[in-house]
Every structure is written in C-alpha cells, then in structure tokens.
C-alpha cells in the first residue's frame, strides 16, 4: 500500500515543467501570477469573515482536506475530506444541471435548453430553487450545475442541451437566475464548464483512445481575448455577479494550456478581472498537475484521485508536502480553504447541512460504507427520502412554456373533438426497458425527455406523449391509434389515412462523450432526425392532410425535407421536457397553454449553413488536437446574418395562438458616471494560522487506512521519500512561474474592481420602451426582444441585449421596458485590455425575433 502512495508524484517539478512546454507554432496562453486571494468584497463579506475565522483554527492537513476529494468510493460522486475537530463534515458534491443523478424519489426537470426556450427569468429562478431544495433534502452540499459551457459554438455539440443558448446574453441571464434559485435554497451552485467545453470529441484522452483516436493530450480551443470576453466569458461574468459559490474548470486546453492549470483563465480572467470569491474545482479527472494547478488558481481537485479508484492524488498528501517545503506558499492553501468555506457559509449550508441519505452506487437499502471496495461498515446507505414536493406541476409548466410553435397553418389548437387521432413514431411511446432502463439515459429508445451522460437524473416516472394524448382523446370520446415503430411505414400509411389528425413524433439525441449511441460519440454525427424520422413524417403527410410534427431534440435538426409539405400543418419543438413530457405537450396542443416559447437557437437549411464542423479527426499528431475559433463571435444567428443566409426558423422565433403588434419605440439617455478603469492595489496575501513541521502530518497510527481513499497525511518526515518524486529538490526558478509565489499587494486590473468586472460596466446608460398590443382573440404571452448594432465593420449585424415576457389580454397594450448597460454597448479592446465603447454609430431594434424587428432607433453617442 505504501508503494502506491509513494508513486503519487503529482506535485513534482517535472509535471509543472512539462505543462509549460508547448510547440512554438501553436497558440499559447499567457501566464498570469500570482493567484488572486479572496477579499470578501460586497455580499461575500460576512461569509468571508466566518471562513477566515474557521480556517484560522485549522491545521495544514485540515485545510488540505477541504481542497481534495476522497475518491469515488463514498456516497456522493464527489466528497471532500472532513474537519471533525471543528465540526465540519465532508462536503458532498453531486450531479447535475437538471436534477439529482444516481438517486431515487427525485424529480427529473426540463433541460437547460428548455429553460432558454421559455425566455423567462422568473421561471429559471423557480426551477433553480426547486432543484436546490431537492439537492439539500438529499444531503447534498454542492449541485454540479448549471452549465453555460458549452455555450453552443456548434449546433451538433453533445452537451449543448445542458446549457441554455448560443447567445451569451440569453444564457447569462438564465444562468444567473438559476444560480440564485439554487443558492437561495441553501445549496452551492457550480457554474460549469469553465471554459470552452464546446465539443465532446477529444475532451479526455482515455475516452478518445477508447474510440480509436491516438492522442496523448486533450483538445486545445484556440481563441482570442475579444472572442472570450464578448462570447464565452460573458455568462460566467453574470454568474459571478449572481454570487455563484463554485466554478468547475473544464477538460479542454485553452490555447494549449489545460483549463484547470491555466493561469490566464483562472487567475486573470476569473479571479482578478471578474472578482470571483468562491472556489474553482476541477471537472472529474481534469486535474493534470498539482503545483501547476494550485498556483494557477484551482482550489479543489475532484474526485480527488488521478484515475478513478487508484488511490493517488495530485493534491492530498502531495499538496501537504508542497506547502511544507515552500513550493506552494501558505497563503495559497489558506486562500483555497477560505474560498471553500466562504461559499459554504454564503448559502447558509452550515444551517442546513445533513449527511447524504443516499448512495450513488446502489439502489439497495443496505451496503458498504466504501462502495468501490466493499469495505468499511455495512449498514443503511439509502434512506429513500422523497424530495419531490409538488415540483411536478412546475416541471409541467416549464415544459409547456418551453414548447416552440415553429409552424401553424390553423390546425392548432386541437378542439378535443377530433374523431380519429393517429399517434405515430417511437418518440411518442415508452422505452421498452423502462424510463431509466439505460444507464445515464444512454440509449435511443422511446420518447426523448433528456440527453445522456452525467447531466441526467433518474426519472421518478415519465408521462409519454402517447399516454397523455390518449387521455385527451378519450375525454372527447374519439378514437386513438398508435404506431410506435418508425420503420413500419405500411402501418403508418394505413393509420394516417384513416385519421382526421396525425401527430408524428420524431427526435434526435446527444450527450456526454463517455457514451456513444448509434455512432454519436457524445456529439451528434449529423443534424438529421433519428430512426427514419424524415421518412416517417413524409409517409404520414402523404396520407393525412392534417399532419402535426412534434420534435423532441437536444437542439436544431434539419427540417428541410418536410417543413413546406402542404399537409404538414404544424411543427412544434418540445426539446427535452423531463418527467411531465406528455402532460406539458397536451397543455399546448389543446390550447390550455398558449404557446409562448421562442427558439433559443437558429434552424438552418443545412449543417454547412452553420459554418465549420466540429473537430472529429486528430490534427496534431498524437498531441493535443487543435480547433481554432476563426469565426470569432460569429456563431448561430450572428453567423447567418454575417453570411446573408435566410434560416428556416430564426433565433427568437416562436408563434402563438394570437397575434401581437409592436409600436412606439422610445430611447431615453440616462445620467451615468463616466467610465474609469479600475486602479490601485490589493492588500497583501493574508495567512491564517501556522503550518507546523513535517512530523505533525505523518499518517496517524490511530487511523486505519482505507484502500483507494485519499488522505492529506504524508508517509514520512522525509519529504522527498514521502513524495516518491525522482525530481524532488529542483530549484523554484527551474519550474515555478515568475511571480507565482508573490504574496505582496498586486495591481488591480483596469477591467476589474468588482463582481463581474469593473462596476461601471453595469451602469444603465439608456432606457428603452416599446408598446406591444395583443391584436388577436385570446390571451397570450409575448417575448419582446431588444437587439443592438454596435456599428463596427467587423461586428455582428445585431446582438441580443434584452428581453422580457409579457402576458397580454386580447386588445390590451403592455409596455416593454428595459435598459442598456455600458457592457451592452462595449467591445473588448485587446490592446487596452479593457472594455471600450467605440465611436461607431449604434442602433437599437425591438421585435419578436432576430429577423422580425419592426422598431428601430439610433442611440445618442456615449463615452
């Protein structure tokens, strides 16, 4: 056993040095050191002070315990060590962004992409709060969600559905509201994946090797700082302003440095510029060095071990050694511990925390304390605590409000008096193996209600479209017949020909890269419908002149083969609606809910219409595959506008059972202070308590070592022997980046100075109003959208900058009011390393989508 610990040379000079070696012709990520220390500014003050008080009482091994997962053998997918002397239990971290993974008696909420389709701030908050309640009641301290990485660079990116939208403003608003909801329920939210987790191919070396790709390093996302700030970083700035407690760094490289040891990404952008006060954790097995990651700003390694269940760690005892020998300064490990505890106190977790009442690894009531080794005490591991409350009604509401009515030729809403209703397509029915019959939902059976991977939850039940529609039809004493075999086209033809309305269900899934479904290695291999979907629709439409298509998908699909068919009278996108799938759908089909979803992405005519494909072939030998963001900020609707392409359905599009008229646009300039770059210096890095000597941290004789469990203690007072590192003793100058250990006061970045960046960025410069009138016969909900032209020759034609959701009665007028901040009107200047408002003339547009903008006005110049 001791040999295994000695082999954990995780914080070695060699590992840090090798992380700095890059080929000369590849993009590089500039270094930024030291790692900024938290200061408890703003709403973090009380939590920070409490964290400082408790960390000041900790010994080094106790601080290290807070930074290191104990491996994959405990109840949660991630658990830190504990500090029992001070009454601090291990911190439980659990997936995922749409509900609790690996448990029971929990809810399966609609996916993030569905929340984006609601364009509803309040609903995003309520959903977040409901999820937070469930996590808290299961004894979970940290929810591993929500996600805004991936943002959605590619329409076929595997995990886009976990996030919200490829538009940074829409994503940022809903990201922030979800975080607020989770944390107001007393659980730490995790903003992930930071940053550029835009595709599944090549995100992990073992995973890629398993698919036959010969690589030794993960994908490098090569991107300039303008694109980072104006697109991918934008939602994370909103998350920081929302007070998010944790941020998860991603598997990918940014400009050829691993995200979890990328000082530009973590130290500069996140902590120095955005003023993040919480802690940075690694994605699972995304830690590739110890000293390198610690000095670059990563505060917690998860799940703690290097490879699952190997008992070795880049932190743990190696972090203890590195602090004892001065490789990692005391102030840095103190800051790591303070950040963890500050997040814990900020959400009030100390008042709510209870031990986990479930096991991630078995549904049995009884089991071993340490599941992976069948070791430790044997007893109750699952208490089967029902945490669902009344969340089913909320899930149904989100599902209904997220349905986007793409096309309607008058066939909807249904009356309930249809005599013969055909339900066609496998996507209408049940998975023959059960709703949870495939691990992490990794299959293509039955109706699609979530994607696959770690971002899933177990269904407590799943109401299928077939079940819900049949109930509706029978209420009206009609006939209903279902064919749920997509390949039985002869049966489809016959059933459709005998129906007064044919409801055709099709889908397309995607998910995390560790699962491949029908050759889709996480990412989709194309944008077509699955399982003969196009032919299914055409067969039905050829035999029924009232064919309604319902699409359950992770994002855009190609509809070019059927959207103009004269017998396809309506098309609805229902996304990934969660457990109430069928019920939320019938609410819209039968008019109980007037459809009010708006598409959070663009529907192109071909895959090529979206621009470059995601990378599926290694292009750098066996080194890190390289993907260059040559498109800059031009993704989704920005790309379509730039290339003068007309999409089938544009970003923001969504029909209603009523109509709306826009008028009376007004622009009011507000009094706001002039922009001034932040200046001054931070205080010196504080230290809390003392470190002691090596003999204080030798593995205690009183502790029985558990195989695979990660401890903070060392094996010997001889630090070189304890490290097992053949390169132990290198001089700092040989491998420690310049300034990385400097705890003296540091200059404040011009773009920094507050949560989310320079506080002046968030000053309101203009108030925009418009009148929206319901000109139809029924009450409806409209989403007015504000777009801005920033005016520059190399800028997008328009960018979304505001929206609202208004319930409007027939004949009623409502006023849409929003503001434009300095950030909304700024561009990132890479020379000044700051935001600037250019001198180009700027315009505002208001309408119902990115292509339907009837109102426009020029903005007065602003400094």
From Swiss-Prot:
Known function: Beta-glucosidases are one of a number of cellulolytic enzymes involved in the degradation of cellulosic biomass. Catalyzes the last step releasing glucose from the inhibitory cellobiose.
GO BP annotation list: cellulose catabolic process; glucan catabolic process
Pfam families: Fn3-like, Glyco_hydro_3, Glyco_hydro_3_C
Entry protein name: Probable beta-glucosidase A
Pathway(s) of this molecule: Glycan metabolism; cellulose degradation
Xref: InterPro entries: Cellulose_deg_GH3 (IPR050288), Fn3-like (IPR026891), Glyco_hydro_3_AS (IPR019800), Glyco_hydro_3_C (IPR002772), Glyco_hydro_3_C_sf (IPR036881), Glyco_hydro_3_N (IPR001764), Glyco_hydro_3_N_sf (IPR036962), Glycoside_hydrolase_SF (IPR017853)
Organism of provenance: Emericella nidulans (strain FGSC A4 / ATCC 38163 / CBS 112.46 / NRRL 194 / M139) (Aspergillus nidulans)
Class in the EC hierarchy, top level: hydrolase
GO MF, one annotated term: beta-glucosidase activity
Region entry Disordered, spans: 720-754
Residues linked to a glycan: 65, 214, 255, 318, 325, 357, 493, 526, 545, 567, 664, 715
Chief location category: secreted
Upper taxonomic lineage: Eukaryota, Fungi, Dikarya, Ascomycota, Pezizomycotina
Entry's localization field: Secreted
Record-annotated disulphide pairs: none
Sections of the chain in a coiled coil: none
Cellular component per GO, a single term: extracellular region
Keywords from the named record: Carbohydrate metabolism, Cellulose degradation, Glycoprotein, Glycosidase, Hydrolase, Polysaccharide degradation, Secreted, Signal
Enzyme nomenclature, EC number: 3.2.1.21
Catalyzed reactions: Hydrolysis of terminal, non-reducing beta-D-glucosyl residues with release of beta-D-glucose
Active site positions: 283
Signal peptide range in chain numbering: 1-19
